[in-house]
Amino acid sequence: MSYTPGIGGDSAQLAQRISSNIQKITQCSVEIQRTLNQLGTPQDSPELRQLLQQKQQYTNQLAKETDKYIKEFGSLPTTPSEQRQRKIQKDRLVAEFTTSLTNFQKAQRQAAEREKEFVARVRASSRVSGGFPEDSSKEKNLVSWESQTQPQVQVQDEEITEDDLRLIHERESSIRQLEADIMDINEIFKDLGMMIHEQGDMIDSIEANVESAEVHVQQANQQLSRAADYQRKSRKTLCIIIFILVVRIVIICLIVWGLKG
């Protein structure tokens, strides 16, 4: 199901799109972590690193898109009867999105560290290695050099080669892109933090209204209690007055009867 933001305002469709994106981000984070675990092993290759970079950029784009959708979801018009359910749904989406972003950013930081380590190894190998066989790529040999427990190198003073420079430039460019992507995720975290803060203010306002209502109810109960007490006292007073009147009437009747007798 496709969704065009800003058109239609279908909350159910938008919520489904947000949930789908969150699931994709979570799955991509798992795949990125799995790929990171292959770096520095015999499975490492330029193609693997390229795939890793593409997966990171795709996930970063998903995160930006999801952030925009959640903002739009919170601004959709709603009826008073739907407000509570809409808020619960938004809170759940924000919580799930925050969890998926946390895992993704953790993988991003690990990827950046791996790239920095790779650049350092390229620079180091250029200074200590006498060169690599012509039938193998520089990056393949670096992977092999990393995986060996006791690499054998021929120490020579040799200037850095063009291949080394190319690899370094590529990896440094990848590092800069990763750092920019990490900053993008930080901005999204700020947006989510603002949403949570606004929700907290709303909750505080609701709690204040509830407390105010409770105070009013207590005051009303006290007034009702006082009214009931007053009513009971009034009835008691009325009964006493009636009793006194009856007694007086009886006395007067007795006196009149006595005079007649």
From Swiss-Prot:
Record carries keyword Signal: no
Localization (cell): Early endosome membrane
Annotated segments matching region Disordered: 128-148
Phosphothreonine PTM positions: T4, T79
Membrane topology: Single-pass type IV membrane protein
PANTHER family reported for this sequence: SYNTAXIN (PTHR19957), SYNTAXIN-7 (PTHR19957:SF90)
Protein name: Syntaxin-7
Native source species: Mus musculus (Mouse)
